[in-house]
Amino acid sequence: MTLTTFALIRHGQTDWNAERRLQGSTDIPLNDVGRGQARDAVAVVSAYEWDAIVSSPLSRAAETADLIAAGLGLPVVRRLPELSERSFGPAEGLQAGPELDALRIEGGFRGAESEDEAADRGLTALEALAGEFRGGRVLVVAHGTLLRVSLSRAVGRTLQSIDNAALNLAHHHAVDGWQLEFFNGGPVMETADA
């Protein structure tokens, strides 16, 4: 059974994360806490050997990937636009409150990418990487909502929000689908195939 192993890492913290603002596709950089989280992630992911590091092109994910790559002595081989965060449209930059509530519709926000669209895009990108690096180990740095909805679809159950720079370890098999071994840095007791 040939497994492709993925470390799926959400970028480190940004000022908008700290302020609890929706970021989406808005390109917000890491803050100092986020840079520290990225450097701290090296200790966790260095327990494995990686064949490739890939990230979203948004600066918060790209810088997280660059910091992890430097710590591992590996290059980032690609920035994939398909790994960009879900677009929240006019809700980006807003915090919880009446203005955000006015944009809510079933499944998200008016003028935003739907959860299903984001899951389709993210899972398609991950499965393409699984095909390209079949039997290998790929470290992917992306975004919380994109990873959550893609992983939820892959394993067939709803997952909670993904922590900044935490290890999410998943395995892909072309026939048996996806298995989640670690989520938010902790072991998963039950795995489910897609």
Stretches found by the model and what they are:
Residues 1-3, 74, 79, 86-97, ...:
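Acidic, low-complexity terminal tails and accessory targeting/binding regions
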Residues 4-72, 111, 116:
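Active-site-proximal alpha-helix that buttresses catalytic centers in soluble enzyme cores
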Residues 6, 136-144:
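Generic beta-sheet signal
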Residues 14, 146-147:
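Short active-site segment of divalent metal-dependent hydrolases/proteases
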Residues 47-49, 129-136:
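Glycine-rich phosphate-binding loop signature in dinucleotide/nucleotide-binding domains
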Residues 55-56, 120, 141-142:
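Short beta-strand scaffold positions
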Residues 67, 149, 153:
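Active-site signature of alpha/beta-hydrolase-fold catalytic machinery across serine-
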Residues 99-117:
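Short glycine/proline- and acidic residue-enriched helix-loop micro-motifs
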